[in-house]
Swiss-Prot record:
Protein name: Peroxidase 34
Residues carrying the site annotation Transition state stabilizer: R68
Species of the source: Arabidopsis thaliana (Mouse-ear cress)
Sites where the protein binds Ca(2+) 1: D73, V76, G78, D80, S82
Reaction(s) this enzyme catalyzes, per UniProt: 2 a phenolic donor + H2O2 = 2 a phenolic radical donor + 2 H2O
Cofactors demanded by this protein: heme b; Ca(2+)
Positions annotated with a glycan in the UniProt record: N43, N87, N216, N228, N244, N285
Length: 353
């Protein structure tokens, strides 16, 4: 759409007039709250939950996949739904980052979820908040804890491929590298790292990310010595050296679709699937993580409590709030004519205060 000079002038007049209100709104919105949509979209959690329930009937992996999307979103410029954006002429998608390419999944489900939310509450719920709710609901539906997530985020105006490559933890990370990765985004407690790693209690991973552990760890020509020998043989059967590198393996062979504490039981038995998992218990630097692994393995509720706290801390990494960003209508693309959309968003936001 073409804007005349008078149209553009009017738009800027609106923005200037709202200047003081915008500042007040931005300051007021800095604190996320579970009640953010209680009046404007009270059924958003039910809509999100129903979408996931329907998808689980045909795709038991989707709960773990959605949780992973949220994690990978929050580690890159905060939880701003930047991971959901497709390529444009202005930026490259985070979907092409090393930690996401050919492994991040669930985007069509997010599309259907957003369409359902928009039908119920037009221009109200951000993709960032919707993905946060979806992650929580995915955990709960898989047998994990239930909690109300703090809300009030807005969506980014771009993706951050380079930042994704720099920030996302890799499956071959050592414990010092893992700690540095978490610390880099403000998650500096050992419990943040150990509890959030428990997200690997369900879901699957590709053989290509564990082949070195199984056959040529650190270029030694030998397997990772921290691997349980029986588990090693099981994994070699699932991932032959010259087999399908994209073949999938359960993170937790005990209860692969259930969100429970068996991940930590596995670590104690040296049955962590990827190196970065087993590092929490087997690294020489694990003096502050081993006690947490033991505690979570011994007590499901202890793990659940720590996981909820860590999820909320991760969800609060540099949130985009107030009049920053926008509320995308389609999670894959920045709103067209975003200036006018943002003006409407500001008016709606201020009027709701």
């Amino acid at each position: 759409m073409h804007f005349s000079s008078s149209s553009t002038s009017s738009t800027w007049t609106i923005l200037i007039t709202l200047g003081c209100l915008m500042l007040h709104a931005s300051l007021s919105a800095a604190q996320l709250t579970p009640t953010f949509y209680d009046r404007s979209c009270p059924n958003v959690t039910n809509i999100v939950r129903e979408t996931i329930v329907n998808e689980l009937r045909s795709d038991p992996r989707i709960a773990a996949s959605i949780l992973r999307l949220h994690f990978h979103d929050c580690f890159v410029n905060g939880c701003d739904a930047s991971i959901l954006l497709d390529n444009t002429t202005s930026f490259r998608t985070e979907k092409d980052a090393f930690g996401n390419a050919n492994s991040a999944r669930g985007f069509p489900v997010i599309d259907r979820m957003k369409a359902a939310v928009e039908r119920a509450c037009p221009r109200t719920v951000s993709c960032a908040d919707m993905l946060t709710i979806a992650a929580q609901q995915s955990v709960t539906l898989a047998g994990g804890p239930s909690w109300r997530v703090p809300l009030g985020r807005r969506d980014s105006l771009q993706a951050f491929l380079e930042l994704a490559n720099a920030n996302l933890p890799a499956p071959f990370f050592t414990l010092p590298q893992l700690k540095a990765s978490f610390r880099n985004v403000g998650l500096d407690r050992p419990s943040d790292l150990v509890a959030l790693s428990g997200g690997h209690t369900f879901g699957k991973n590709q053989c290509q990310f564990i082949l070195d552990r199984l056959y040529n760890f650190s270029n030694t020509g030998l397997p990772d010595p921290t691997l349980n020998t029986t588990y090693l043989q099981t994994l070699r059967g699932l991932c032959p050296l010259n087999g399908n590198r994209s073949a999938l393996v359960d993170f937790d062979l005990r209860t692969p679709t259930v969100f429970d504490n068996k991940y930590y039981v596995n670590l104690k038995e040296r049955k962590g699937l990827i190196q970065s998992d087993q590092e929490l218990f087997s690294s020489p630097n694990a003096t502050d993580t081993i006690p947490l692994v033991r505690a979570y393995a011994d007590g499901t509720q202890t793990f659940f409590n720590a996981f909820v706290e860590a999820m909320n801390r991760m969800g609060n990494i540099t949130p985009t709030t107030g009049t920053q960003g926008q509320i995308r209508l389609n999670c894959r693309v920045v709103n067209s004519n975003s200036l006018l959309h943002d003006v409407v968003d500001i008016v709606d936001f201020v009027s709701s205060m």
